Amino acid sequence: MFINRWLFSTNHKDIGTLYMIFGAWAGMVGTGLSILIRAELGQPGSLLGDDQIYNVVVTAHAFVMIFFMVMPIMIGGFGNWLVPLMIGAPDMAFPRMNNMSFWLLPPSFLLLLASSMVEAGAGTGWTVYPPLAGNLAHAGASVDLTIFSLHLAGVSSILGAINFITTIINMKPPAITQYQTPLFVWSVMITAVLLLLSLPVLAAGITMLLTDRNLNTTFFDPAGGGDPILYQHLFWFFGHPEVYILILPGFGMISHIVTYYSGKKEPFGYMGMVWAMMSIGFLGFIVWAHHMFTVGMDVDTRAYFTSATMIIAIPTGVKVFSWLATLHGGNIKWSPAMLWALGFIFLFTIGGLTGIVLSNSSLDIVLHDTYYVVAHFHYVLSMGAVFAIMGGFVHWFPLFTGYTLNDTWAKIHFTIMFVGVNMTFFPQHFLGLAGMPRRYSDYPDAYTTWNTISSMGSFISLTAVILMVFMIWEALASKRVVKSVPLTSTNLEWMHGCPPPFHTFEEPAFIKSSSK
């Protein structure tokens, strides 16, 4: 029974729960790695060995947080749970493939951990650039294991993407058009398209790196007519869409949360929101070289990538102001989920503004590989993606479990986390402007003050993570059952009660067509 339900599952709700638990576990590993980084940087001087081990920790932190925390929770967890419920489908289009997508992740995770355990580990950064990732600078199996780990995670995501695209296009009730599906469903579909188009390019790049390392090919070795810059183009053609993959489902969740707790029946500017997400998805593919302003591209190439990158701010602005317009005039309920959503809007906007700064190629020459970049992407990830995950979690927790979280603890948790992440990452803007470079385990004494404050902030965030574990335990132990959920007519996922039955929509939903 247990094995059939949890190992051979074909139920989107159970698989979503598995993704959630896996993501939470990986999130703790990733948090532990980030604490190691901040402990090392809390004071000048060495704490944990040399720069190689430091860079192994940094690399593992990035991979774990991206591939095993944010993506499994947002796409695998929330996506699996909510998409079928929101479109009235009995399950995903390919339920067994759905199970395989999940079970490819634990082996992938184990391969990544194994890469740190053998030889000196993969201290390449998450970009895995050759020649540092070649078999001279990284002899041994570490980088090879990392490549295999990425292959598995990539296959998992591609299969998941095929599944979501098919489900969303094909499994809606006949009366519903694509433009009547909720924004979270749209965000997952656009994310899936991005995954489907970008991951094969990453797979090609790391496969060539694998053959360069082991079969004496020279794709990225000038000695044999190759070029390391080719690898950078291949990697970032995946890497830039990837950062939009990480944030787009968050956009969808924030739209739902803001609408719900503003007491509105629909978000402001639904069509604008959809087109903005599609624009972001499209533009995300034609800006990749803004990660490469320092490699010596032509001035006209840099001018193009600067302009194209800045254009992404327009659809992003459409989304931010539509969220604010949704809030406007609403009967606002200051629930924990709403606090996360408001925190998201504010902090994501700050992260977006530093992104506009970095898009200027001439400025980026100075700021590239400094802590300014670290501050920028942690504002959009550690306070964008993570705040969206937390907001979605406290909002839909009653749906997933049937129990309610303690409201007071949840608000305290938000406050601690808000203070912690800002104390961690705001000072890093100053460090970057002062020229402190990334990926070094030590630094000149002049940078001590802000690093110490940043490290103290990371421990405040750690406190928040521990408090969240307590909150979940408290909710599951107290068993406060959900009495009623308001606004179910415009929030289809709540219609079956909390938690919904194992099987939903086994008979097709009846849709009344509204004449507009």
Curated annotation (Swiss-Prot):
Compartments, as annotated in UniProt: Mitochondrion inner membrane
Record: residues binding heme a3: 376
Catalytic activity: 4 Fe(II)-[cytochrome c] + O2 + 8 H(+)(in) = 4 Fe(III)-[cytochrome c] + 2 H2O + 4 H(+)(out)
Annotated positions binding Na(+): 40, 45, 441
Ranges facing Mitochondrial matrix side: 1-11, 87-94, 171-182, 262-269, 328-335, 401-406, 479-516
Binding-site list for Cu cation: 240, 290-291
Keywords: Calcium, Copper, Electron transport, Heme, Iron, Magnesium, Membrane, Metal-binding, Mitochondrion, Mitochondrion inner membrane, Respiratory chain, Sodium, Translocase, Transmembrane, Transmembrane helix, Transport
Main location: mitochondrion
Positions with a binding annotation for Mg(2+): 368-369
GO terms assigned for molecular function: cytochrome-c oxidase activity; heme binding; metal ion binding
Chain ranges on the Mitochondrial intermembrane side, renumbered to this chain: 41-50, 118-140, 213-227, 287-298, 358-370, 434-446
Transmembrane segments: 12-40, 51-86, 95-117, 141-170, 183-212, 228-261, 270-286, 299-327, 336-357, 371-400, 407-433, 447-478
Pathway note: Energy metabolism; oxidative phosphorylation
Names of the cofactor(s): heme; Cu cation
1'-histidyl-3'-tyrosine (His-Tyr) cross-link, chain position(s): 240-244
Chain sites annotated for binding O2: 244
Protein's UniProt keywords contain Cytoplasm: no
InterPro entries linked to this entry: Cyt_c_oxase-like_su1_dom (IPR023616), Cyt_c_oxase-like_su1_sf (IPR036927), Cyt_C_Oxase_1 (IPR000883), Cyt_c_Oxase_su1_BS (IPR023615), Cyt_c_oxase_su1_dom (IPR033944)
Gene3D superfamilies named among the record's database cross-references: Cytochrome c oxidase-like, subunit I domain (1.20.210.10)
Cofactor remark from the record: Binds 2 heme A groups non-covalently per subunit. Binds a copper B center.
Subunit structure: Component of the cytochrome c oxidase (complex IV, CIV), a multisubunit enzyme composed of 14 subunits. The complex is composed of a catalytic core of 3 subunits MT-CO1, MT-CO2 and MT-CO3, encoded in the mitochondrial DNA, and 11 supernumerary subunits COX4I, COX5A, COX5B, COX6A, COX6B, COX6C, COX7A, COX7B, COX7C, COX8 and NDUFA4, which are encoded in the nuclear genome.
Classification via PANTHER family: CYTOCHROME C OXIDASE SUBUNIT 1
Name under which the protein is recorded: Cytochrome c oxidase subunit 1
Organism: Pappogeomys bulleri
